[in-house]
A protein has these predicted regions:
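Signature of N-terminal electron-transfer/Fe-S-associated modules in redox systems
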Residues: 3, 20, 33, 79-80, ...
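C-terminal structural segments of small proteins and small subunits
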Residues: 61-64, 68-98
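N-terminal loops that bind phosphate or other acidic moieties
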Residues: 3-8, 12, 51, 96-103
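Long, contiguous binding/interaction regions
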Residues: 28, 79-80, 101-102
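Compact, glycine-rich, soluble single-domain proteins
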Residues: 11-61
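Detector for Asparagine
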Residues: 14, 31, 92, 98-99
Length: 103
């Protein structure tokens, strides 16, 4: 049986680019899936589950990256990772002020 492959090009929208914190968020999310994940910038392709590899891309605001996932959960992995990038890496940071029981 062939493994599913899904890919999409995304643009880094956060002003600080893909520095340590968002790279860590990306890698942690990628590692929740069994699919392999790769990220391509220009002619360079790196392991999307390795923070050091992601950081070597030096992706700044406006950089286009192609994310590819291959495996049983490729579509779900790609959707989650693209949403994270599209939202400027803010998905895992809900405002605690909005959850206050005192409001």
């Amino acid at each position: 049986m062939m493994e599913a492959t899904a890919s999409r090009t995304v643009t880094i929208v956060n002003p600080q680019g893909l520095h340590a914190r968002p790279a860590d968020m990306f890698v942690k999310l990628a590692n929740r899936f069994s699919s392999t994940v790769s990220v391509r910038k220009g002619h360079e392709t790196v392991d999307g589950k390795s923070i050091l590899s992601i950081l070597t891309l030096g992706a700044e605001e406006g950089t286009q990256l192609e994310i590819t996932a291959t495996g049983q959960d490729a579509d779900a992995a790609l959707a989650a990772l693209c949403e994270l990038v599209d939202q400027g890496f803010e998905l895992n940071e809900p405002s605690e002020a909005n959850n206050s029981p005192w409001l």
